[in-house]
Amino acid sequence: RSRRQRQMCIRDRSRYLHRLRPSAPVYVRGPEVTWQLPSHAKMPDEIVMMVGGTCVAASHQLLSNVLDTRDPATSPKLTVWYAASSLDALQAVPDMVRYLKQYPEHVQLRLWVERMPRHSQQADLCTATGIPVGARVRRLDTATWLGRLWSRRPVHELVVDGVAVPVHSGRISLEDIQTRLARSELWRRLVLVCGPDGFVHALAGPKARDLLSQGPLGGMLRASGYTEAEVFKM
């Protein structure tokens, strides 16, 4: 479905729920499987999930489905790239940090925030179940403004439960992919892309017109040398 179609569905469901009386039954269908590694497919060395906005819930499901049900020693490395418009828009980061803290050798998390504050401040985050968690944003020391301009490392960190997560200002760029996710024949990497239509389009090209099939690979991932077998649009 397109973003507009999803928004219309959410609006209709909200009106329906608002009209219900207390104690009225609500029937839920699902969950719907949007992606599953084929049984005949070889396990990749790494699964990268690029998520934008509220679609971050899918990355939390990936972490829990892999690490809570399998032996981490035999599981692929899991990398999550999470892009949001602002610090306040970040969701479920504390849940992902819990996995990062428990499995530091298997989980990596990077954040991209379009509108970063100029100074260090507190960030009000919450878990997937809505429990508020305090976090602190700190600016990393850099020698000069020129060094900040040319440095590929982030200039901010989000500290949650004692764990520092790198935060990049702006959006995920082609340079980010080519420097941090350079394609290699010796390292099997599968990239999952989940987010608003514009987010998916920029990274991997649009899905097919039927909104169900994948469509041709495009965007930054294709420009970085990835193939259709290595990318899945959710």
Question: Which positions does each model-derived feature cover?
Answer:
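Single conserved hydrophobic/aromatic residue that forms the stacking wall/gate
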Residues: 1-10
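Histidine-anchored nucleotide/phosphate-binding helix
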Residues: 56-72
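Reductase modules of NAD(P)H-dependent flavoproteins
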Residues: 81-234
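Loop/turn positions that initiate beta-strands
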Residues: 21-25
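Short alpha-helix capping/helix-loop boundary micro-motifs
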Residues: 11-18
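Structural motif
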Residues: 46-48, 190
